[in-house]
Amino acid sequence: MKNTEQEKGKIFIVVEIIEYVPKSVVMKTIIKKSTGNITVSSFDTGEALTEKTSPFDTFFHVIEGQAEIVIVNLSHQLVTGQSIIIPAHSRHIIRANVRFKSISTVIKSGYDEVSV
């Protein structure tokens, strides 16, 4: 299945453009560019993404349900309307103890913070 961008210039309701699929994690690209991407996801109860790291910060926003985000072994419970920024280079897991839908936004700056 091809993961194409959401149609431009057309109104949509984010929570309605993705459905739950039993025993699955479903992802749909809203917009994807070389400088970053916005993705909407649905996680069925009991599903999770394996632990990973990203070279960029990730803005994660729950639009329906409740998500568990584990960042460097610290668990965060997010409910509808809540958000968290997953820091770049941090080990993290996204888990569905109950099903949820979310939006993830990654902006690829190409630069790490530099302290002087």
Q: What is the meaning of each model-derived region?
A:
Residues 37, 66-68, 75, 91, ...:
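Structural motif
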Residues 73-88:
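Short acidic-glycine-tyrosine-enriched beta hairpin
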Residues 49-51, 69-70, 86, 91-97:
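Short beta-strand His + acidic residue motifs that chelate non-heme Fe in jelly-roll/DSBH
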Residues 88-112:
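Ligand-binding loop in jelly-roll beta-barrel domains
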Residues 56-68, 72:
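Glycine- and acidic-residue-biased ligand/ion/polar-headgroup-sensing regions
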Residues 24, 39-54:
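Conserved short histidine dyad/triad with adjacent acidic residue
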Residues 1-35:
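A short, N-terminal "cap"/entry segment at the start of jelly-roll beta-barrel domains
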Residues 63-64, 79-80, 98:
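A cytosolic small-molecule/anion-sensing beta-strand core signal
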